Amino acid sequence: MGNCLHQAELSPSTENSSQLNLEDLWDFPYNGNDSFPEINYDASLEAAAPCYSCNLLDDSSLPFFILASVLGILASSTVLFMLFRPLFRWQLCPGWPVLAQLAVGSALFSIVVPILAPGLGNTRSSALCSLGYCVWYGSAFAQALLLGCHASLGPKLGAGQVPGLTLGLTVGLWGAAALLTVPITLASGASDGLCTPIYSTELKALQATHTVACFAIFVLLPLGLFGAKGVKKALGMGPGPWMTILWIWFIFWWPHGVVLGLDFLVRSKLLLLPTCLAQQVLDLLLNLAEALTIVHCVATPLLLALFCHQATRTLLPSLPLPERWSSPVDTLGSKS
């Protein structure tokens, strides 16, 4: 953020020096052998100096952005190929159309990572940056909502128990994700060649809406799933949300939602940081949380592959041999 949002306070030595200037020195007799009291100017300058934070994701981090983007695109493309490959066992995964959409969301995120990366010169326009943030957060919101539905509905997604559910989920969840990206799309642009959110009084409402959306989707949603799982298990009301390895996805976005909320409170002066060090720690956490979100585009396809491998390894031995090969085709027909 650049500067600490607290007022600089003078040290006791500085306050004493000011009193000497105003009171004692007025009537202080001067002769050639006497000297004026020493004033600690260094303490005053240090207290009034602005607080600067070093950006962890500066121009030197461009290779990290590019590497994550390339690996994410390759991994997501591989998972999509396996999911749509005819007569392949991954099509037996419960809710594989939802899993395919997760891979699509990860691929979209990977594609826009270089657009928002620093160190690519000053050629990016505000429109391109706004589009980049729209896809960046839109794909993340869609993945989080898809994971929530996959956990809530569980095997129903793959058993054909709810006709037309896949199409309804696709339209509804991606539409909701697109609406949630409107605030950050309008409150972002290019500054000195870098894509960045725009913080101003006029756009404060948009930034607040975006912060609330991130906190609700990335923080409250996984906490709600865990809470529902625990409550239902404790009360004996059923298994609750379907807990799988895919829930690890939220680890990559949960810190971002928390730190983004803290940063907004500080910018709005609803939360005052006592020291410059606290401000620098918050800025560092913002950069680390952003780096963790970038890593998710590589981790998500790996989680999908591991989930499909575990699901098919458990499911295939329980199916008769002819049904093992007919099930993917039947699944495709029932979902179309």
From Swiss-Prot:
Residues 1-63, 117-129, 188-207, 266-287 are extracellular. The keyword Transmembrane applies. Glycans are attached at N16, N33. Disulfide bonds join C51-C276, C129-C195. It is a multi-pass membrane protein. The chain crosses the membrane at residues 64-84, 96-116, 130-153, 167-187, 208-228, 245-265, 288-308. Keywords: Disulfide bond, Endosome, G-protein coupled receptor, Glycoprotein, Membrane, Receptor, Transducer, Transmembrane, Transmembrane helix. Atypical chemokine receptor that controls chemokine levels and localization via high-affinity chemokine binding that is uncoupled from classic ligand-driven signal transduction cascades, resulting instead in chemokine sequestration, degradation, or transcytosis. Also known as interceptor (internalizing receptor) or chemokine-scavenging receptor or chemokine decoy receptor. Has a promiscuous chemokine-binding profile, interacting with inflammatory chemokines of both the CXC and the CC subfamilies but not with homeostatic chemokines. This is Atypical chemokine receptor 1. It comes from Sapajus apella.
